[in-house]
From Swiss-Prot:
This protein's name: Probable endonuclease LCL3
Enzyme Commission identifier(s): 3.1.-.-
EC supergroup of this enzyme: hydrolase
Chief place of localization: mitochondrion
């Protein structure tokens, strides 16, 4: 082979190798940006994600009965989480659920009330509350992390005490239930919209070893710890409103959770009143 032909072949090989490396690099960059970039706040989530895609991550804090903080872990283990990229470790909780909401104990009633008709209703309410207060809250909330605030779609949980206003009945119990169910665990989040508090309104799904995949909003409705969302702004159901209303009806007819009360003020009514 002549020297000129040899040089031409080498140049062609170098060009092919260069194009291949450039293409591979661009593909890796594209893949990382599209599938492995961590979203650290609500505004990081691209519009293309909303209503179409699910995000995987860990619940690091639960501050209320219908919202929590979500640490995004794109790609899971295959995305390097736990071996290349650090995952926040939870701190074990040494307090019981009742201590976490200490004022709930003060809502107990005097023993001599059994002679009154009201005692029966109060006993039923207290019994309903106690089953939630006994739930295990395994971890403490982790704060000051790059997390996305998540608001559960389609439901409203009873309000807890805020800004000097008293808590609604079952507000603390809803918080404990949610902490027991998801705090420190991995969940899937489907972003739907952003509310006025810059929270990501989302449908949330988690795995239960005894029941498979669970819709978190639906499970709260089933246990009578939330009502179907009544507001006209940021109303999101992800095409599950009829199902949510059906299970709310079942919980109400069976007097589960907050529905055991004879007189009940919805979270929406409570917020309007105060």
């Amino acid at each position: 082979m002549r020297e000129g032909d040899s040089n031409s072949k080498k140049s062609a090989d170098v060009a092919v190798l260069s194009i291949t490396l450039t293409g591979s690099t661009l593909t890796l960059i594209y893949t990382y940006k599209r599938y492995l970039t961590q979203f650290k706040r609500t505004n990081d989530i691209p519009r293309r994600i909303f209503r179409k895609h699910w995000l995987y991550g860990k619940v690091t804090s639960v501050g209320d009965g219908d919202n929590f903080h979500f640490f995004h872990m794109p790609g899971g283990i295959r995305g390097g989480w736990g071996w290349l990229r650090p995952v926040p470790q939870m701190i074990k909780n040494d307090s019981t659920a009742e201590k976490l909401v200490g004022d709930s104990r003060n809502m107990r009633f005097f023993n001599f009330n059994w002679i009154t008709h009201g005692r029966s209703t109060k006993s039923k309410i207290q019994k309903a509350k106690s089953q939630f207060l006994k739930l295990n809250v395994p971890y403490k909330n982790r704060k000051n992390l790059p997390t996305i605030p998540i608001r559960l779609c389609g439901i409203d949980a009873p309000e807890r005490a805020h800004f000097g206003n008293p808590a609604q009945p079952f507000g603390n119990e809803a918080l404990i239930w949610l902490q027991n169910r998801i705090l420190g665990k991995k969940v899937w989040v489907k972003p739907l919209s952003i509310d006025q508090y810059n929270r990501c309104v989302a449908r949330v799904s988690y795995w239960d070893w005894f029941g498979g995949w669970k819709d978190l909003s639906l499970e709260m409705l089933k246990d009578g710890l939330a009502v179907v969302y009544e507001g006209k702004v940021n109303t999101e159901f992800d095409d599950r409103e009829d199902k949510y209303r059906y299970y709310e009806f079942l919980a109400r007819s069976r007097k589960k959770g907050l529905w055991i009360q004879n007189k009940f003020e919805t979270p929406g009514e409570y917020k309007k009143r105060i």
